Every structure is written in structure tokens, then in C-alpha cells.
Amino acid sequence: MSSLLDKTRMLNRILQKSGTEPVDFEDICDLLSDVLACNVYIISRKGKILGSKFYSGFECDEVREVVLKENRFPDFYNNKLLNVNETLSNSPNHDKCVFDNLKDCSINNKLSTIVPINGNRERLGTLLLARFDKEFTDEDLVLAEYSATIIGLEILRSKQDQIEEEARKKAVVQLAIGTLSYSELEAVEHIFNELDGTEGLLVASKIADKVGITRSVIVNALRKFESAGVIESRSLGMKGTHIRILNDKLLEELKKIK
């Protein structure tokens, strides 16, 4: 069996391999499952399964169905996990199903270890390990807690990337709106009121007559938005123009103007 140092180095190699790219949670699950000989689940604070790996021979049909079909744990069970504020090791299931205490577990002597994933002074998720008959050792727990730290950092990085992407999309929309004349802005508001959701068919002449502007104003407004990359348009000839919104912040920013 590899030493703790060797196992830690394996985890570090996953980090080094990723470089500036996000770490793949499935890679962490695969490694932990192999070196700890257990089932591994990385669960978000809301119960979504971010990564998982079943160890060969340790497959529970009930859990497998949840993981593969639902891709999330039931709320009541996730709440139990979130109530664990520090590592809880070798918790027995008393031969009962974790999702239904009235139902017997198909596999006896199941032991679970729950490791909270924290970062920036908040709970980000849970690292859940499960195996049968053999208890998790202190060495196993050190590796699990180190892994939880790595996962926490990656979740925080992912959140920050998402925040930055949202800000970028909003800024692009605001710049695009800023290029419009008053009449073009008025035309745009009517155009997107006509759309059914994020895409639809636009007949420029109908909107021009309805608003009392020229068709060229509508065409110019659409061209500016298309140049900014916030929409995609395709002429269908006499039928009109098919428009699809590419930036999901567009409608939100237009509502603020009204």
C-alpha cells in the first residue's frame, strides 16, 4: 500500500496537471476511490452530485440509482450531511438504507465518513466516503480532509469565475445598449417584447408600423446588437427575421431601462 506521502503527491499531480483550468472533480473521486478502496461522492451545498466513483464490488443499488438518475441526493439526506460540522468517521448504517430507515440495506456493515467542505468561512458542500467492513484509518482521514480542502478551493474558484463571467456579460450588454439612439432603443424594447422567450420570429415592417418608426431604425439596432455578440439573427425572406438571444443578461438589462 502506498504511503500517505505518495497518496498526497498523487492528489498534487491532479492540481499540477490542471494548471489554470478547473480541477475535474471526477479525477479526484477516481483517485480517492482507488487509494482508499471506497465509494466517493462530492456533493454541493444544495445536494447536487459534483463527482462520484463507485469502488468495484461496493455498489449499492439504491445509491447508484440516485447518483445516475437524479444526480443529486434527497434534500432530507443532504440536510443531515450539512448538519455535520466536522469530520464524522466510520458512521455505521446499522444495516438500514441511508435513504429509508424502514428499509434494510442490501449490503451489511456499511461505514460512512462525512467530511465537510468549507471555504471563505462558509459551507460549500460535503465529501462523502463509504465502504464495507473495514474502518477508515487516521491516515485515510488525513487524505480525505486534504482532498476536501482542495475541493473547497476549486468550488470557490468556480464561483469567482462565474461571478466574473456574469459581470462580463452584463458589461457587454450595457455597452451595446449605450450605442443605440433613442429611436433604436425604443425599437429594441418593442422587438424583445414580441419575442417568445429567448428566440422568435420578427417582422420588422409590423413593428415599424406599430411603433411609428422606419424599418431602417430596427435593422440598425439589430446590427449593433449582433456586432456586440448579444444576439444572432437570420433572414427568412418574406417571413421575417429569426432572432436568438445569445447573452442571457440582455432582457434583464432592458427591463431596467423601462
Swiss-Prot record:
For this entry, list what GO says about its biological process: negative regulation of DNA-templated transcription; regulation of DNA-templated transcription
Subcellular location, record wording:
Cytoplasm
Q: Name one GO cellular component term.
A: cytoplasm
| Region (GAF domain) location | 1-156
Q: What is its main location?
A: cytoplasm
Give the family from UniProt.
Belongs to the CodY family.
What role is this protein assigned? DNA-binding global transcriptional regulator which is involved in the adaptive response to starvation and acts by directly or indirectly controlling the expression of numerous genes in response to nutrient availability. During rapid exponential growth, CodY is highly active and represses genes whose products allow adaptation to nutrient depletion.
Which HAMAP family does the entry link to? HTH_type_CodY
**Name of the protein in its database record:** Global transcriptional regulator CodY
